Amino acid sequence: MKTFDVLVIGKGNAALCAALSARDTGVEVGMLEAATIEESGGNSRFAGGVMRFAYDSVEDLQKITDIPEDEAKDTDWDSNTIDEFYEDLYRVTNYRTDPDLSEALITKSHEGMVWARSQGARFIPNYGSQSKMINGKRVFHGRFPLTVNGGGAGLVEDLTKTAEKKGVSIFYETRAVSLIYDGQRVLGVRAKQKGQLVEFHAKSVILACGGFEANPEWRTRYLGPGWELAKVRGTRHNLGEGIKMALDIGACPYGNWSGRHAVSWERHAPEFGVVENSHDPYRHSYPLSIMINAEGKRFVDEGEDFYNYTYAKYGAEVLKQPGQFAWQVFDAKVRPLLRKEYSGRNVTKIKANTLEELAEKMEGVNAKGFLKTVREYNAAVKKDVEFNEGLRDGRCTEGIEPTKSNWANTIDTAPFEAFGVTCGITFTFGGLRINHQTGQVLDLGYAPIPGLYAAGELVGGIFYFNYPAGTGLVSGLVFGRIAGSGAAAAIKAG
């Protein structure tokens, strides 16, 4: 048996931020990680690394990363004011996001980024996917101009180094299975450590071990039939165990339990994410495409918004299609604009010099239906509006359903290419109800459960239906800090 003041379950971004926040108060901190050292880091290790936080100007960014003065002046850095952040989060969640949780997330996001830098996290401008050269000037769009150096894996490695230097004890291949609870407060956890059942005692336990996206039985139970067939973009270790052990002692479930972050993903990707090429299966250039199902029909508004605001919901739409697949179809006019992943290895791709040839090559697609769809789509494109991929250009279709609201180009210039996609699930939205100021888990009567805290993807109530890109890592950072400081403060208060 080992004893700590604070015991953190998990070792991703939220868990590490919780551990560091608690450790900086002087308490003894331990971490339990189900994975091996090589696989550790939860979903954070697979994340792209973009960070959505509130900022008004480049001066706010310079508190987080070093930006040379000439670069600062010669670039349009966009903004993501507190009001703009609220607007985006409320809009994409259909105004269902919890007001207290969203306020904490948004108002503490910038200070959280500054703090993360002080803990060893390294941030750099996100030139690759979130900026364009317009009239000789680099212009950011999408409201998240910074990313983590080295992506999510780099973030995990940097924060792990800091945690180890500060004396946080990390136990690998140690999967928490239940809470030690005396009916009044949580006293620790029982865990499987390399096949043996062991106990860890603590004055406070912080659950930060992710959702249930890697559990096909829970996916089917809560997300619905067919979800057992989805690919998992990240770790295989997020099985919902942290949520279950809290519910078992009376914690309150909260949030969009049938909701999830799920994207268009390489059709023949592995069952789980692969850290070494975690970005290769991305297929995020679909706003420039038409997406076709097995019947040869379109089924979403590909140009509803920038992919930052639609990618997390469109994977579910692909999963609903016959055979759980779709094809993203492009012509030569937009091919140079596609993200680099479309030119990588292990890409399900076909190419043809005519639409008829493409139709015959698209595996599992009704060729006549596809050609009819393209004819009707091309005729519906509003050609008097100028195409501009850097803006919501309003170049749309008229008279067809589903409409395409932006970036509608005719599919008429050879060669034509189609890329096969399926659904890749990232994380689940349902979880536990917490106190937004302390991170304490609440019971069914909304009273705090003494000694139990939570952070990260297993916190319910923040995301509903959809998700604005870059918010997940920042949410883990913010609520990890809150849970860590809350747990430590309760210990010191006696």
Which sequence ranges carry the predicted segments?
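Beta1/beta-strand and adjacent pyrophosphate-binding region of the FAD-binding site
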Residues: M1-A14, G30
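Glycine-rich FAD pyrophosphate-binding loop
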Residues: D24-S44
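N-terminal glycine-rich dinucleotide-binding loop that anchors FAD/FMN and/or NAD(P) in oxidoreductases
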Residues: R45-N80
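Rossmann-like flavin
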Residues: A72-G136, N353-E376
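Conserved redox-cofactor binding core of oxidoreductases
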Residues: P99-L197, N215-W218, S264-H268, V381-T410
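A glycine-rich dinucleotide-binding beta-alpha-beta segment and adjacent secondary-structure elements
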Residues: S178, G369-N466
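Glycine-rich loop(s) and the adjacent beta-strand/alpha-helix scaffold that form part
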Residues: Q193-Q196, F200-A269, G439, G470-L473, ...
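An anion/pyrophosphate-binding glycine-rich loop and adjacent beta-alpha core
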Residues: L239, I243-V365, G369
